[in-house]
Amino acid sequence: MSARDPEARPGSAGACPSGGGLGAISGPPAGWHRFTPAQTIVRTVSQLAVAVLTAWMIARLGIRWDYVADAPQQVADLVHRMFPPEWEFVGALVRPLIQTINIATLGTAVAIVLSIPVAVLAARNTSPNAVTYTIGRVIMVMSRSVDTLIWALMFIIVVGPGSLAGVLAVSMRSIGFVSKLFAEGIEEIDHGEVEAVAATGASRWQIILYAIAPQVRPVFAGVSIYRWDINIRESTVLGIVGAGGIGFVLNEAILGLEWSRVGLILVVILAVVVASEAVSAVFRKRLT
């Protein structure tokens, strides 16, 4: 086969007279094109604008660069103080650790119960009208726009410090997340089953119960387990603001400069988070 053979393929011996074994690249792949001068100017100006804006924002943060330069040494010193952990303190962490898990579990359960009606209102195919749809969406946005720690601070004012404030904070934060995914699951159902149940003369709530609920049950279960996993992590820090759990013990250890105890608490928190992630992954895998 000669180099002029029209059937020669790129990378073959006839198409690569210069040798090398990898084939000569005669040009850019199909679909590639060069930027025009105007496009190049626009891209360059855009990149410079982003760089300038980033530099301006960093300058406005008021960062103490002398602290930043000293940060590696401070981190090394802090780690040196925290390790080895104070293993003798493990027994004192059992109760606050269980309290943390309870806060996450109860908060998730409350959120699931409250998220179901919100999701029904916020789903286009189940919301009675535009007003209820808007109400459902507003509830979702309000819940997700406020961080869990801020919810905790608000509920501490209402019900006082302790686990109840933590449960309420976790549930209020979770409603927006859970109801949003619930609503998306409801909107993606097979409408053929809904029409079949509706043809029997079923009411709106009977349609939701017998045609919609069976289809979205796996989604509900998966989202609930995933949110519980997230809440385990969030509940570990609620005690810092007085909402109970292992975070309260962590805050006391930090204020008391008991760094070996802080190291132990961080190790325990890491173990709990990893365990909850593993449990969540197992249950989600079984549901899919």
Question: What are these regions, as identified by a protein language model?
Answer:
Residues P161-R227, A278:
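Membrane-cytosol interface at the C-terminal ends of specific transmembrane alpha-helices
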Residues M1-A109, I116-P117, L121, N125, ...:
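N-terminal, non-cleaved signal-anchor transmembrane helix
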Residues M140-S174:
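Generic hydrophobic transmembrane alpha-helix motif, especially the helices
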Residues T108-I116, V120, R124, L149, ...:
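Hydrophobic positions within alpha-helical transmembrane segments of bacterial inner-membrane proteins
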